[in-house]
Amino acid sequence: MKSLKSRLWKQDAPGPTSPSSPTAVASTQSAEWNKYDDRLMKAAERGDVEKVSSILAKKGVHPGKLDVEGRSAFHVVASKGNLECLNAILTHGIDVATRDSAGRNALHLAAKYGHALCLQKLLQYNCPTEHVDLQGRTALHDAVMADCPSSIQLLCDHGASVNAKDIDGRTPLVLATQMCRPTICQLLIDRGADVNSRDKQNRTALMLGCEYGCRDAVEVLVKNGADLTLLDALGHDSSYYARIGDNLDILNLLKTASENTNKGRELWRKGPPLQQRNLSHTQDEGSVKSTQREQREPHSFQDLEIENEDLREKLRKIQQEQRILLDKVNGLQLQLNEEVMVADDLESEREKPKSLLAAKEKQHEESLRTIEALKNRFKYFESDHPGPGSYPSNRKEDMLHKQGQMYTTEPQCASPGIPPHMHSRSMLRPLELSLPSQTSYSENEILKKELETLRTYYDSAKQDRLKFQNELAHKVAECKALALECERVKEDSDEQIKQLEDALKDVQKRMYESEGKVKQMQTHFLALKEHLTNEAATGSHRIIEELREQLKDLKGKYEGASAEVGKLRSQIKQSEMLVGEFKRDEGRLVEENKRLQKECGTCEVELERRGRRVVELEGQLKELGAKLALSVPTEKFESMKSSLSNDINEKVKRLAEVGRDYESAQGEIRQLKRDLESVRAQHIRPEEHEQLRSRLEQKSGELGKKVSELTLKNQTLQKDVEKLHADNKLLNQQVHSLTVEMKTRYVPLRVSEEMKRSHDVNVEDLNKKLSEATQRYAEKKQEAERLLAENDKLTKNVSRLEAVFVAPEKHEKELMGLKSNIAELKKQLSELNKKCGEGQEKIRALMSENSSLKKTLSSQYVPAKTHEEVKASLNSTVEKTNRALLEAKKRFDDTSQEVSKLRDENEVLRRNLENVQNQMKADYVSLEEHSRRMSTVSQSLKEAQEANAAILADHRQGQEEIVSLHAEIKAQKKELDTIQECIKLKYAPLARLEECERKFKATEKGLKEQLSEQTHKCRQRDEEVKKGKQENERLRADLAALQKELQDRNALAEEAREAERALSGKADELSKQLKDLSQKYSDVKSEREKLVEEKAKQASEILAAQNLLQKQPVPLEQVEALKKSLNGTIEQLKEELRSKQRCLEREQQTVSQLQQLLENQKNSSVTLAEHLKLKEALEKEVGIMKASLREKEEESQKKTKEVSKLQTEVQTTKQALKNLETREVVDMSKYKATKNDLETQISNLNDKLASLNRKYDQACEEKVSAKDEKELLHLSIEQEIRDQKERCDKSLTTIMELQQRIQESAKQIEAKDNKITELLNDVERLKQALNGLSQLTYSSGSPTKRQSQLVDTLQQRVRDLQQQLADADRQHQEVIAIYRTHLLSAAQGHMDEDVQAALLQIIQMRQGLVC
């Protein structure tokens, strides 16, 4: 496979042909990647089967072709698990073993992502299972990592090697244990995985499981025979890794496993020597006992084991939660790293405008130079206008020559030998910044500053959050206060309205009454008038005066009534005014109420829901009340449980002590029996043996009765204990169910209130933060507007400087860079918009969660009545349990009294044993005497050895004396020789010589005699030494014989003991048989007596019948009837006898079975000391487990706090990133504004060009009026100017159309930019053409031919430039696509190994290019 580096090198490096040739690029692209390949890849990613099959039907399409990222459509389909697409590709035909850039084939990818069906399909097409990726892993490794047992089974069935190792030497079993997957470990072991396989550091799977705290996986490995004693390269074993992991469960498991292995080895080494000597019936009894021991386990151990298992499960859950939290923390850290990478990319892209500004400054300097040249030209035109004919032409020619020189120097400065695509590095490497040499120190300072700014943003965000929370709480409080005020105002207004309505009713009643009175007065007045008229006719003066007085009174009353009516009307008006004001107030209040109702409508809906929920919960609580009537609160229940468990443990201890005492008593009894029987068998008279046997039988019978009573009591106590355990289990289950229901359905009121407070505080803080953020946003907006205005000014100035005269190549380069920047910024804008949308969705989700939390907090509470009822029921159960405990204590006291009685009897038996021991002392030799005799023998041996040593010392001294004598003899011989020589020399006489010889002979004889005596003595000593050695050997043989005799006696004693045991067992059996036989004999005697009595009765009846027969004649029928009845009775009696015998046999069998059960119970019972030790060890382990649980809970709480802190930091960083993105959006808006300004400047420049053309026309007209000879030239110039005007107008129209299109659609921005650049190039070319035409007009007389030649050359240049631009664009876009794909994958977190390798290649290439 071709690497990414080689492809990039091919794209960047110039070929043998020209790099600007598009044919070469097209050929390489068609060979490497095709549009059909791209379509196939997209269809494979979408899972469109029809599209995939249609594309595959075309020629030249290969589904295994790799893209820039190093993957093919075949790999994509396998990784996504699309079975239909995979079938289509496989049926089309492909090499199944094709690999991607990471060395993985399709089988690897299907196993990695857990697609078992795709894996099965690939295996059907014979995809190899032994292929390895760049990390040395097979498909089985990936399946284990994906936790897919079905794919593992498929791979193992198709011959995948279970013990294959990767680069680090890890097998699939090692990876499974490292990732804590016990089921997969068991599956791999069942498939033949090596449990003790090692990696490159000599670490086994067990060591890694202990290090990572995978208790279940370690248990699986230990069960399947993992070696605990293996060491790694550093000399550490599995227990060391378990200590590093701080997992007590694993340490305990390893300890128990090592102890079991050690015990097994010891048993294997020692072997059972005594069991070989035992009889066959003893072996059978031992096997039966072992089976019964295995079947029966005490309840206390079961309870403790259950509790331990519960604690271990809790530990496992806590460990799993810790792992999940660690995974979350790692994920958050990865997100942080990705966001930091994105921020770095944004910073690098921000630095691009700086480089562009630097380039623009350079262009500004060049434009200043061109402006100066233009000024000189304008001066020349102004000075040349009024002069004569010959002189100005010469001056013009000089100026044109100067301008030609100036224009020729400018391209020479731009390195003519270098091709244009090599001038700007930013064209080929858009992500590299062409800034001047910036040091790493400045970059570090920038990063530090940005870090400080991020920290300030983080602090400000924290403060904003707190403020918003406070504001939220404040607003909630205000809403509540407003709601209360609204209700209060409603009530007041209702009361006032009622009062006003009552007052109106009273006023109306008064009005009606006053109107009635007025009507009465009117009628009365009319009546008076009539009466007065009548009396006036009569003319009585006195009556008239009285009537006048009455009239006055009536007028006064009428005026008072009218005044009252006016007052009432004024009161009514006032009340109406008040009612209007109240109505206005009511309207305002209604509006406020509506506003508050809109704000609190959701609250009311929530309250209704909560009310429904409360009703439902009340019903559930009522139902639970009945269930909880018998339950107990957790604290009291735990105290009760602890007290009950303590009492039960004490009782169990006492029972165990009683059992141990009972077992010890039985053991002592057995030993006494064995000793007594052995003594009797060897050295006791038969009479004494029978007496002792009778006594022992009596005692054994009494002890058997007591044992039976004790066993019955023990059974009753065990039943009581079992009942207590059952009650305890029921209570535990009830408490567990209640705790689960309380945890799942109810939340404490304190927690809900605290959550409400915290939410209120959060809302207030958020509101405050919102207000502050809005203020800051307004301030920043103002600053941004100010900066935009300044930027507009600067851009206008720059555009004015740039727009006068700019080189075409530089302008094209700038435009290409701007296009690339625009495209990148658009993509960034889309990404930022997506991120903003995601952030808004997250905010909505948080708001919904907040509302749901509020609902749940408000709806959950705990009533007090149920709690009191539960308390009462629990108190009653506690009293019941106390009573049961008192009864159990009484029973225990009875058992203790019986144990004391047994101890007294044991003391009596001990006394008998002492008597037997005294008899043994009298009959046998004691060990002390034997040791004394042995000591005397050893002393005699020591004395003999000492004497032997003395004899050897004397022998050595004699040998030394003999040696000294030999030396003296030799010296004397030498002297004799010398004397003889002297005699010979001096001629001594013969007599003397003879005498000397005699003397010498005498001395020789004496010496020889001495020698013989000494040799004789030596021989005697040697003989004595030999005799001592023989005596020593004989004594040693005697000692060995004595030791053998002692060993034989010990063996005989052991055999005698075993025989005594067997005899005692037989004696017990015989005694039982005797008892049974005696009982049977007594039963048979009683039955015989009954039968005798019945026989006598029958004989008397027969005699009576015979007498009757003799006295009276009886018919034969009666006699036969009597015979039949008698025969029937006889048969019935026989059947009854047989049934009784069967019952006897059954009872005997049951008795024998019960006796065997008793013996088995005695043998299988455990000592109390061992039980206490086990219990203490378990309690210690439970305490350690609880302590570790507390520590781990504290650690988990700390970790949760850390995770919450990390989440807050992540949120703050996200907010900071969002702020940065908003800033970048502002920068984009600035960029667009600058672009619009540039376009406006271009239009202004075109206007200026038009004005310049007009001025030029005027000058030409003046020249025509002055010079008639040059009319033809001026006409041609005018025609050319008109053509140029038309072209400028066309260009202006096209620019306007382009602007309209830009405003209409943002999709065609790139095409419009290209057109603008082409138009700008046309304008510049027209300028150059104008200059050339001016030179031609003044220099030659045939302008049309030269104009056509210039036009052709310009068109060729334009074509060349367009081709170069197209080639540069293609290369630029290809490189951008490569960079973007890898950077986007890195930013999105897809940092696979292939992406990392690609990024490393890019960095290396960058460094090479920079160098």
Swiss-Prot record:
Location within or outside the cell: Nucleus; Cytoplasm; Cytoplasm, Cytoskeleton
Cleavable signal peptide: none
Single Gene Ontology MF annotation: actin binding
Glycosyltransferase is among the record's keywords: no
Induction: Up-regulated during cardiomyogenic differentiation. By apoptotic stress in a dose-dependent manner.
UniProt GO cellular component terms: apoptosome; cytoplasm; cytoskeleton; cytosol; membrane; nuclear envelope; nucleus; perinuclear region of cytoplasm
Domain of life where this protein originates: Eukaryota
Coiled coil spans: 299-379, 442-624, 652-1380
Keywords on record: Acetylation, ANK repeat, Coiled coil, Cytoplasm, Cytoskeleton, Nucleus, Phosphoprotein, Repeat
Disruption phenotype: Mice show a high incidence of inflammatory lesions in preputial glands. Cells around the lesions showed resistance to apoptosis.
Database matches in InterPro entries: Ankyrin_rpt, Ankyrin_rpt-contain_sf, RAI14/UACA, T_SNARE_dom
Functional description taken from the UniProt entry: Regulates APAF1 expression and plays an important role in the regulation of stress-induced apoptosis. Promotes apoptosis by regulating three pathways, apoptosome up-regulation, LGALS3/galectin-3 down-regulation and NF-kappa-B inactivation. Regulates the redistribution of APAF1 into the nucleus after proapoptotic stress. Down-regulates the expression of LGALS3 by inhibiting NFKB1.
Subunit structure: Component of the apoptosome complex, composed of APAF1, pro-caspase-9 and UACA. In the complex, it probably interacts directly with APAF1. Interacts with LGALS3, ARF6 and ACTB. Interacts with RAB39A.
Protein name (Swiss-Prot/TrEMBL): Uveal autoantigen with coiled-coil domains and ankyrin repeats
Gene source species: Mus musculus
Gene: Uaca
